[in-house]
Amino acid sequence: MNDLTAIFLTCNDLPEEWTKYHKEQLLKSLNGAPLIVMSQKPMEPWGGNVTHVLQDAPRSFSNIYRQLLRGAKMATTDYIAVVEADTLFPPEHFLQRPKKRHVGYNMNFWHLFTWGEPIYMWRNRRGNYSMLSDRLYVIEALEERFEKWKDGTPDRMTGEIGRPMVEHNLNITVRDVDEFETTVAVVNFQHPFGSDEMQRNQRKRGGLVRAYDVPYWGKAEDLIKHFK
C-alpha cells in the first residue's frame, strides 16, 4: 500500500499488555504501509515505516482533530486512515478507497465494553476511529474548522468530520461522506480511560444489535482478555 498513511493518535493511557497486543495487530493489518504515531508521551521507536511525533497540545476533544490535521499535512499519500489506541482493525479496512472529496467511514464495526457482560454491540453512528479518507479533503475540512475556531472547538460541539449536526453547530461546511463496509468488522473498545465522561463513569450504553462471537476476532469473552 503506497497510497495510504495511517495516523495513530494516542494519549498513552491504556494498559501495557493491551498496548502490546494493539501494536502487534496494527502492524500486521497495515502490512508495511506508512504509519505516523502521534503520542502525548515519548515512545520507543517501532522501526520500519513508522514516524513518531509528539502531540503539541494537551488532551481534549478538539486536540484530536488538531493532531489529525498535523498528521494529514505530514503525510504525502492520497489517503489517510485514523487509528485510535482502543480500536482493532482487520487488514481489509486499510484496503478501502472511498470516493475522492469525501470523508470515508467504515460502518461495519462493533463496540466492546470493558465492563459488564462481554458482548459485542453495534450502533449506526460514524466514528472517527473508522475514518479512512481523501487526505487533501480532510486537510481542507480541518483547516476551515480551526480557521473558524482558532482557540479550539468546545468539547460539547466537537465531533467527526462530515457529521451534519457537528458541522452545522460549528458553522462550517457540511462535508460529503462516503460510507463503506468491510466484510470483517472494526472493533472499538469502550473503557474507563477514555475522554468521554460517560465511558469514564461506565454509564455509556451500547446498541441493540449484539453478538457473543464474530468472524476473525472470535468470542467477546476471549478478546476482552487482551485489555489488561
Spans of model-derived segments:
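The conserved acidic donor/metal-binding loop of glycosyltransferases
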Residues: E84-L88
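Short, flexible/disordered intra-domain loops and linkers
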Residues: L14-Y21, L54-S62, R123
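Short catalytic/ligand-binding loop motif for oxyanion handling, primarily in non-cytosolic enzymes
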Residues: P15-E17, E44-G47, F89-E92, F113-W115, ...
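Short, acidic, metal-binding catalytic loop of nucleotide-sugar glycosyltransferases
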Residues: K20-A33
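Conserved catalytic core of nucleotide-sugar-dependent glycosyltransferases
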Residues: F94-F227
